[in-house]
């Protein structure tokens, strides 16, 4: 992901543009927050959802619920477009809270899964948002920068670039399971059983990981289709 002069960034519209070099991450984690190149800040959105004055009473109620449950981020990301279909907005918000805050995974583990999903889904906006969340949760920029982009994403690339940087066998198992499911749309028996063993022999934890992958793939498709820009 790191080049010697410039890094080529492919945006959501399919065009490419040259961005300044992202400096090689230092071992000093205090500099981590300054090393990510935001790729989708200038996107012109296709649709950001209904305007407040045009919302129905049901949409306003759902909007208020989203704002109450997401005081720091509000209607950013896919939530605006979702509001155009109230039942989808309501259900998506509830599922999002469940997979983000209602699982047995640590925040660091969850953010690792989300960032892998965003990279594989070619969603710069999702990655831009969750780089900051991942750093807060304890991931380093070295780990985040090592995650392969969509066109080079594979279980082999993850094994070479990311796995050596992870802290423990539990994280490595989660990353391997996530990468294989994203890359192959299924996982082999060996991966399933080894991941289950690393996670306390609980199938339910694999349900949680798979649900996070599914939800953030869904979110990535929304962000990509409607060209929702990033925010720093």
Residue ranges of predicted features:
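N-terminal export/membrane-targeting signals
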Residues: 1-4
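Hydrophobic alpha-helical segments
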Residues: 7-8, 13-232
């Amino acid at each position: 992901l790191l080049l010697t002069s410039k890094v080529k960034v492919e945006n959501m519209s399919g065009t490419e543009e040259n961005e300044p070099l992202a400096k090689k991450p230092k071992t000093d984690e205090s500099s981590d927050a300054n090393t990510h190149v935001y790729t989708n800040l200038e996107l012109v959105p296709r649709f950001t959802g209904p305007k407040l004055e045009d919302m129905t009473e049901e949409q306003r109620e759902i909007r208020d619920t989203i704002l109450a449950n997401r005081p720091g981020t509000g209607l950013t990301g896919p939530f605006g477009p979702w509001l155009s279909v109230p039942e989808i907005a309501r259900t998506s918000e509830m599922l999002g809270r469940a997979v983000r805050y209602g699982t047995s995974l640590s925040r660091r583990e969850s953010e690792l899964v989300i960032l892998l999903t965003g990279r594989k889904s070619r969603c710069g906006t999702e990655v831009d948002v969750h780089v900051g969340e991942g750093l807060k949760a304890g991931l380093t920029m070295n780990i985040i920068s090592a995650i392969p982009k969509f066109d080079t994403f594979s279980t082999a690339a993850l094994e070479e670039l990311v796995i050596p940087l992870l802290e423990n066998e539990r994280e490595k198992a989660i990353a391997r399971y996530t990468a294989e499911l994203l890359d192959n749309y299924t996982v082999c028996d060996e991966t399933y059983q080894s991941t289950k063993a690393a996670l306390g022999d609980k199938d339910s934890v694999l349900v949680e990981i798979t649900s996070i992958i599914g939800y953030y793939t869904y979110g990535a498709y929304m962000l990509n289709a409607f060209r929702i820009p990033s925010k720093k």
